[in-house]
From Swiss-Prot:
GO terms for cellular component: membrane. It comes from the Bacteria. It is an enzyme of class 2 (transferase). Condensation of UDP-2,3-diacylglucosamine and 2,3-diacylglucosamine-1-phosphate to form lipid A disaccharide, a precursor of lipid A, a phosphorylated glycolipid that anchors the lipopolysaccharide to the outer membrane of the cell. This is Lipid-A-disaccharide synthase. Its EC number is 2.4.1.182. NCBIfam families: lpxB. It catalyses: a lipid X + a UDP-2-N,3-O-bis[(3R)-3-hydroxyacyl]-alpha-D-glucosamine = a lipid A disaccharide + UDP + H(+). Pathway: Bacterial outer membrane biogenesis; LPS lipid A biosynthesis. One of its GO terms (molecular function) is lipid-A-disaccharide synthase activity. The keyword rRNA processing does not apply. PANTHER family: LIPID-A-DISACCHARIDE SYNTHASE, LIPID-A-DISACCHARIDE SYNTHASE, MITOCHONDRIAL-RELATED.
Amino acid sequence: MVDTVQAVLPADAGANGNKRGSIAMVAGEASGDLLASLLLEGLRARLGESVDYAGIGGHRMMAQGFVSHWPMETLSVNGYVEVLGSLREILATRREIREQLLARPPLCFIGVDAPDFNFGLEVPLRRAGIPVVHFVSPSIWAWRGGRIRTIARAVDHILCLFPFEPEIYAKAGIPATYVGHPLADVIPMVPDVAGARAKLALPEGKRIVAVLPGSRQSEVRNLGATFFAAMDRMHRMDGNLAFVLPVASAPLREIVAGLHAQYPDIDLTVVDGQSHLAMESADVVLLASGTATLEAALYKKPMVISYKVPWLTAQIMKRQGYLPYVGLPNILSGRFVVPELLQDDATPEALARETLLQLNDEGNIAFLRQHFTTMHETLKRDTAKLAAGVVVDLMRSRGVV
């Protein structure tokens, strides 16, 4: 962790050549890193090299010239109970970022997802006159709708990934723009299954099951054992299956290796990152609820969505939720189009059974391919360009660029 203001943001333009200043960004996990990297691409296209970018980000953001001064993993914690173990570090990080950004104000602050962390940072920054944009609306239409009052104090503009969201914010007087979902720009309309399998060196002649138990260690600890037991059952029910499992970090690879050792007969390929290739290669996907469910839909894949959290977290979420489903494909469809097995329903037997049903139902596979193609077309909007345009317009309206 950095100790000085000087280390967080670059010096002002007078001391840094032709630089106008810096845009500060905070992204909290792998999905936010991807979204932010595309926004950075759009900003760099609009602003050239006149602006620096710094804060918290991942490897995709850093590939766009972003400088991350705190580990993104600090924020990669989910759930009410689970976050308590990391709360002191999270709050200390947020306090340090706030103090340093207030001491050396950026041209703009962009919070990317991670709403519980970012809104607490955005409120004082906006109060200090720093333009604030939040990229990714929290799911206020699904649960914790009261957060919209905090959002009204936290942001000057919110960038929405789904077409129904701006109307919700308009009713609360919050400027919001639908920019489409950047994943719809990144993921091809027609997946190259054979190409993905070749790149991952997957076994030939077998049907492929992609398994994604999550990108956070807490998720993999909650779901990993159940998913591996389900994989073992599928392997014993159908010997023509091979599995591919992407891991987002070295610690996750260690957890997965320990689980695989318990089921050595499973034909499993573990890959570092490359979750998109894993899904593109698959005939069916078994995965944790989250952004990956939308990615699987954009790859036009049948899937089974699952999730497990500690009992207390589940009770809190249940009391604050409004919808009967948690997976993005179902939420965007307004109905169940793929099965969800959550909490006590997520047994190895049920997961194996539902995954094989999804794999073998040709009529349902054809329906999902068409349904998800229509969804893809709705979400494809050149997000990087639209989102960057909103940010630049806000900064120009404030006279900072």
